């Protein structure tokens, strides 16, 4: 019997990407498509290719309460923080509303007081290769946090924690579908700009997983999708590659590249895979760990479906895109 799915906030980029994977999944069946802005409209209002294939959009509250086995919440952070999880459903939240266990961090990093702070302890952080989800309430990691943690978490005990810098660059889809000046073509094209320097909300998420803070500097790339995080740190002992090999041995999603091979944006775009590589800086002896992934794939929707698969006891890669199409 198929597993029923509701998507809350299906009209945004993350929601669209989740929908695409649900439709390709052999065990999942769409029950409700939620969007407050498109409620009552046919699915073709989102994408003409969906004309006549799917149920019409309903308000997000109806999609949430539709009784689906799995709910994917693709809402802005503050709206997702107010969600009342349906009983017995697996709920995967793609926002940052439940990634931080400490309620005191939300005003500083997200700009709001958490409306349901007592519920935070019930959520598990789901980065499958490193922190498999436990329970039915799953906080899907952020895109920068995913890349940084895939690069750093396996070797965190081998690094000087005061030395870690994450230099990350992402495509404009990471800013969401709603138009804004910083994602306008006139600003983005032929440009490379750092943003939220020292204040990005994924920094405390990374700290919570690693146990120490990192200097995170995100940049906006003039591409639609994809993310590369280059992580620099002073190693305290040898054996970093062995730790990475152990972490990703047998993984169908995260590929540790051969020595000397660099991760590339083009190989991970439109996929749910990630590439990781380790280098040594000849001049300083610093370790350099690079991770490339698609911010909408492994950095959002692909990881959400992977988390749902694990929570359902299914093969983790069902419904995922694990190979790009060369051009």
Stretch-by-stretch model annotation:
Residues 232-327:
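C-terminal active-site/capping subdomain that shapes the small-molecule cofactor and substrate pocket
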Residues 17, 21, 150, 154, ...:
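Alpha-helical scaffold segments in soluble metabolic enzymes
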Residues 34, 128, 167, 217, ...:
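Residues in well-ordered beta-strands of folded domains
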Residues 182-276:
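Contiguous C-terminal substrate-recognition/catalytic subdomains in enzyme active sites
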